[in-house]
Amino acid sequence: MGNTLGLAPMGTLPRRSHRREEPLPNPGSFDELHRLCKDVFPAQMEGVKLVVNKVLSSHFQVAHTVHMSALGLPGYHLHTAYAGDWQLSPTEVFPTVVGDMDSSGSLNAQVLLLLAERLRAKAVFQTQQAKFLTWQFDGEYRGDDYTATLTLGNPDLIGESVIMVAHFLQSITHRLVLGGELVYHRRPGEEGAILTLAGKYSAVHWVATLNVGSGGAHASYYHKANEQVQVGVEFEANTRLQDTTFSFGYHLTLPQADMVFRGLVDSNWCVGAVLEKKMRPLPVTLALGAFLNHWRNRFHCGFSITVG
């Protein structure tokens, strides 16, 4: 009796498993490439500032700001914000209308609209008393793995002047984003364009970003050491002004003390720091800042109180 070769039925043969790759994420907006690094650095403070925030409803809130400084006259700002019902993310609500008016009548206004699921529009207006200074219109389309933006700044058909800015970002991998910016300006007797290439690499605990073009270069590095410590390094070079700046920022969070400390040191011999303290259970935040420029022998300090 011959040997019998037992074959498994075709239905029981092992099949090769194909791992389904995750789709590439949207790279976000071009203006937010250096956002993580910039948030590490402290905002310069000078004088005394009082800010009172008031939430009138789930859609509308106002803020009153009084600023007194030795460098100028005291000023008052009224800030209003309206947020609609369409919330795409914790930080994105449509439509959104934001306005800020000072005691002299100057106005800064911004309107954000969601025209379609992937198409967004923004309008920015800035006036100085009764004169228009800036009017800007943006259109942004966010695909699955890319973002395209077109901006028109101060369009004037009569004066034949306009500023056009085009942005494009593409996710190459889950960590690498590449893109560019094209700035075109036109006015009587002058016309030109500037091209800038951009790239961002995101790791688990750090992000490196680079913008380079004929107008200069901008590089930043953000590193999150742990939940309390974040650092940022920034390099900026401007070919038109023949100026180069190197900055180091430090961000320290003390959750048990409800305190946040931000500090910076740059190549212009400037040292600065801002300390924020939340006075719980009161809805009050105190901030104290000081900045010293050794090269120009200038010292600025500020104190602010935020209620609400």
UniProtKB/Swiss-Prot annotation:
Location in the cell reads: Mitochondrion outer membrane
Record organism: Mus musculus
InterPro entries cross-referenced by the UniProt entry: Porin_dom_sf, Porin_Euk/Tom40, Tom40
**Stretch list, region Required for mitochondrial targeting:** 281-308
Q: Which GO terms describe its cellular component?
A: mitochondrial outer membrane; mitochondrion; pore complex
Q: What does this protein do?
A: Potential channel-forming protein implicated in import of protein precursors into mitochondria.
Protein name, please? Answer: Mitochondrial import receptor subunit TOM40B
By sequence similarity, the record places it as follows: Belongs to the Tom40 family.
Residue ranges, annotated region (Disordered) = 1-29
Keyword Mitochondrion present in the record's keywords: the answer is: yes
User: Partners and quaternary state?
Assistant: Forms part of the preprotein translocase of the outer mitochondrial membrane (TOM complex) containing TOMM22, TOMM40, TOMM40L and TOMM70. Interacts with mitochondrial targeting sequences.
Pfam families noted in UniProt: Porin_3
Q: Which UniProt keywords apply?
A: Ion transport, Membrane, Mitochondrion, Mitochondrion outer membrane, Porin, Protein transport, Transmembrane, Transmembrane beta strand, Transport
User: What membrane topology term does the record carry?
Assistant: Multi-pass membrane protein
GO MF entries: porin activity; protein transmembrane transporter activity
BP GO terms, sorted: monoatomic ion transport; protein import into mitochondrial matrix
